[in-house]
Structure formats: structure tokens, C-alpha cells
Amino acid sequence: MKLSFTKNKDVDSEDIANKVQTFENIVGSSLVQKLIKAATVKCKKCGKNRLEVAIDYYLGKMSDICLKCRLLVPVIKTVVGNSISIFGMSEKELIDLMQDSYWTKGLVSVIKGLGETGIEKPFVPAAPLQVQWDLTDSELSFKQIHDEIDKLADFGVAHITFIGEVDSTFIKHADDVGMYPCLTGNGFNLEKIDKYVDAGVKFVDISLESVNPKTHNEKLGIDNLWENAVESIKKYNEKDVYVEVSTEVTQDNLLEIPQIIELLKQLGVGWYKLDVVNGDLTDNQRLELFKLIYMENINGDMQILTNDPQLGDVASTIMCNGMNMIPTHFF
């Protein structure tokens, strides 16, 4: 499934701002927050906490629920309906998307977070939306790893990212308990990719530090790593696994970023994540980079993310000048 947001050059920025303000007023009201907080208790009749039951009913996943849980459904419809209208998404599109359990986990965590802390910048969900796990050899048994995956799923974590190559059974178990299994690394053993796909991996993040193979390989200290990364991207795309590519932005490769963007577009990459090294770029270089990210998100086919919350400030400033709103990583 390709993840995207609506790019509509005819969107009225003032209308969006009004919708955002309406959403903040609704969610920020003491009544809505009290109702959401009260809904986090487990319903003995329905078998889950009331918020999850009401959301599942709204999404059409449950039909027979008790009266107390049913009373929450209008609150859910109001909160969700106002939020999706900001990005031009229909209720049917949302309901279709949320049939996958990991999307529902994320929605539950977001609504719980709204009840606990309201709208904060950066926003704090009730549970981490994603957990990254670097499994070290022989630290834990298979059973212990499976048990920890179960705990994360029960806590409400929607995505789990395994760092490096792991046993495919862990990917399968994460998929079985309703999480979104991901892998991240510099490249992958091409012979293992089919196993990972069969186990249920949904998303991979692959590092690419340069358009020049020699520069990339020397930076990471491994021969043929650039070639492996590109082949991994191609093979995962063939298997319909969502591909994100990451680059650590420094003075050494800043001028290459536009070229890397063009290469990744040719390879059919869905997301491009730029990790900006603290203190390495000048303020003006960072500003120009964030402007590039903004314009690529508005005009390009590939979405670009960053670990730097300053993109939110840049996007807000540009939007005030009549341009479109984009989702940013922390803002």
C-alpha cells in the first residue's frame, strides 16, 4: 500500500487554517478530553477498553457493543471527521485504510494522546507509534523476543522496526499480533529478501549516503554496499514492499541531495528521509534544505521527511504566504 497525502494546488489555505482551528477547539474542550480519558477503562461486556470498542464500531469491525461503548461513537466520529477533513480525506477512504490492525492501533494511540495531553507541538500519542529494536546475538531467547513483541503490541505500539537482518520468524510474529513489521539497514542479503516478504515485512528503510558508489562505500567502510543498497531497493519494490531511503546530511553530501532525489524517483522510492547532523550545516544551508523539502513535497511524486522539527516552522511560514500545508515530522 502506498502511503500518501493529498496534493491539491487549489486548496484554500485560509479554509485549512479554519479547519485546524475548529479541530483544536473540539479536541481541546474539557468535555471531549474527559470523555476520551474515561473511555480508556476496559469494558467487561465488550472485552476491550471502551475507546477501542467505539473505534472498532465506527470502522465497521464490531457490530454488537454495549450501550456505554456506543455512546462514545459520536465523539469518535466528531474527532476523526474533523481531522481527516483537514487533509481532504473522505470517511470511506479512512475506514478502508483502517481495516488493517496496525492503522487502528495508531488511531487508538493518537486519540488516547489527545485525551491525555490535548494538542501539543510536538504531539505526544499515548504509546509510541514506532519502536526500533536492535537485536544483539544471543542476548534473548526466541521465546523472550516473542514475549516482548507481545508486550509492545498490547501496549499499543503500531510499528516495530528491526535494525539489520533478523530471523524472519520475528517479523512474522509481529505481523501476527497486528503490528506493522519494518526493517532498516545499509542493505540486505538479497537471498533473504523473499523470506522477509513471505514473513510479512511491510516497510524497509535503506541507507544511501551519495549518488557516487565509491563515496558511499568509503563512508560506510564496506565494498559494494552502494550496489547492494540499490539492488535491495529494486527487489523490495518488485515485491510491493514500501521503500524508504535515508541519508545523513552533512557538508560532504549536501550539494548531492537534489541528485539523490532524482535517483530515488527513478528507482520508485516512496519516502526519502533526511537526517540532518546537528551543528554541521549553517543556518542558511538548513533553511535552503527545508525549502527544497517543502517544494518537493508539494510538486514531486516522492515524499521527503526529516528528523529536524525546524521544517515545521519553515512549512508554517511558507503556508502563511499562500502555499499549501504539508505534514512534517515533528510539527
Question: Model regions: which residues?
Answer:
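A C-terminal junction/extension of Radical SAM enzymes
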Residues: 280-331
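Short N-terminal helix-initiation segments at or just after the protein's N-terminus
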Residues: 70-79, 181, 279-288
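Charged/polar, solvent-exposed surface patches and flexible loops
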Residues: 34-41, 53, 57, 147, ...
